[in-house]
């Protein structure tokens, strides 16, 4: 697969820490999902079902419990809390544009690097004037992005780069934390 080409090249250049990356893709059948068939179109969904996705892994399981309701076309606009400051639900706008409140014992915020800070900041109250989880004033201040790169090369023989996962691999030898550069982690 495409990782073998990247790995061999990294080894020849002297890199030591080269791996396929940590992905939610089965290498063998597990939890009712097939093993990866190395089709190479992971960004477009997974035909074999090996790649983890809430849409076809967790949501169907939750529906089977009878304790789950999926509200499509809804948008959360605020996380709410009680008088002691403990999160107790969310306010959302439903598909018809009506504002609704949903009580909750636990709220999982999983909106990646844009929507998570937006929601935390929009959840400001008199108790949390700068938004939830923002006592240090850092929510929304430090944008983080997963960088990707594409490399093109002429090879002496066919390498079938269309085989394997979309991300061939990761070389982390140069990913050294050096705070003197003005930031933490990264390249």
Feature annotation, model-predicted:
Residues 49-50, 121-123, 138-142, 150, ...:
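Short C-terminal domain-edge/linker segments immediately following a structured domain
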Residues 23, 79-80, 130, 182-187:
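Broad, structure-driven detector of short, well-ordered beta-strand segments within folded domains
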Residues 149-185:
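Rossmann-like dinucleotide-binding core of oxidoreductases
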Residues 1-76:
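Conserved redox-cofactor binding core of oxidoreductases
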Residues 39, 44, 88, 139, ...:
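Short glycine-rich loop/turn motifs that provide flexible caps or phosphate-binding loops at active sites
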Residues 19, 47, 77, 91, ...:
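Residues in well-ordered beta-strands of folded domains
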Residues 65, 74, 78-84, 90-163:
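Glycine-rich loop(s) and the adjacent beta-strand/alpha-helix scaffold that form part
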């Amino acid at each position: 697969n495409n990782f073998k080409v990247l790995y061999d090249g990294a080894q020849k250049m002297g890199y030591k820490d080269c791996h396929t990356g940590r992905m939610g893709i089965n290498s063998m059948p597990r939890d009712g999902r097939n093993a990866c068939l190395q089709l190479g179109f992971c960004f477009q969904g997974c035909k074999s079902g090996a790649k983890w996705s809430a849409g076809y892994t967790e949501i169907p399981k939750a529906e089977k419990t009878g304790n789950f309701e999926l509200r499509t076309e809804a948008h959360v606009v605020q996380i709410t809390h009680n008088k002691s400051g403990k999160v107790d639900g969310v306010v959302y706008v439903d598909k018809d544009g009506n504002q609704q409140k949903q009580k909750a014992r636990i709220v999982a915020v999983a909106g990646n690097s844009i929507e998570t800070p937006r929601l935390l900041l929009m959840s400001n109250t008199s108790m949390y004037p700068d938004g939830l989880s923002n006592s240090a004033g850092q929510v929304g201040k430090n944008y983080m992005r997963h960088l990707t790169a594409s490399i093109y090369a002429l090879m002496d023989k066919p390498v079938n780069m269309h085989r394997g996962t979309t991300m061939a691999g990761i070389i982390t030898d140069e990913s050294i934390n050096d705070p003197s550069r003005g930031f933490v982690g990264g390249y």
